[in-house]
Amino acid sequence: MRNEYIDHLIVFDLETTGCNPVQDYIIEIGAIKIKDGEIVSKYHQMVNPGIPIPYFITEITGITDDMVSDAPYISEALPSFLDFCDTDYILGHNISFDYRFIKSKCSSLGYTFNKKALDTLTIARKFLKHLPSRSLGPLCEYYGIDLRNAHRAIHDAEATYRLFQCLKKDFMDVDASAFIAKEITWDPPKQEMITSRQKKYLADLIRMHRLVVNEDIETLTKSEASRMIDKILVQVRSGQK
């Protein structure tokens, strides 16, 4: 049994500031494009989250604030990634995590992202139950896949595809249904975006008090904008900037 889309897909991985796709931020996107089983192009983009990167995230990924300070915000970076994803099929390791982040950011910025997905984690859990861990690192070690720079998006994406090839070789003939891409049914909770009145008020506050704001105001939700306004007012009243 052969599924054509197995050899025509986008493999991608994200690094983020946390695990909540609505409240946390993307800081790195790495993707590779597969056609006829070969890597034909790559996509890599650092993303400015607009907030300090948590210390534990820097410890895990090696990504620092300096590395993203001049990077585009997600509102600027997302369109080029969506253009790169020119197929209906995606692949990742624990793909639902990455999918939900992209889906959430697309929703807040007015884009759509509806794909069918293959997940090497799901496949490994089905066929490699004897392994103590089915995380990407241990699976790569099991198959002898070189995973340099783990927890960096582009390297994880490349390793994920090599892992997929190994799993397909070993288990495609055992149960081909495990290699059929499936819909991910998840929609982000609806959030109202920043209002035009809030945008103007924030802009006036920032200009009047000569503040430096390291966030992309255009992508704020209504509640996030309210929190930022309250924070600025508290700082101004206390004499801080």
Residue spans for each PLM region:
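Short, glycine/acidic-enriched loop or turn micro-motifs at the edges of active sites
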Residues: 16-18, 122, 159
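Acidic two-metal-ion nuclease catalytic site recognized across multiple nuclease folds
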Residues: 165-241
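Conserved beta-strand -> loop -> alpha-helix junction used to position metal-binding or nucleic-acid-contacting
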Residues: 112-124
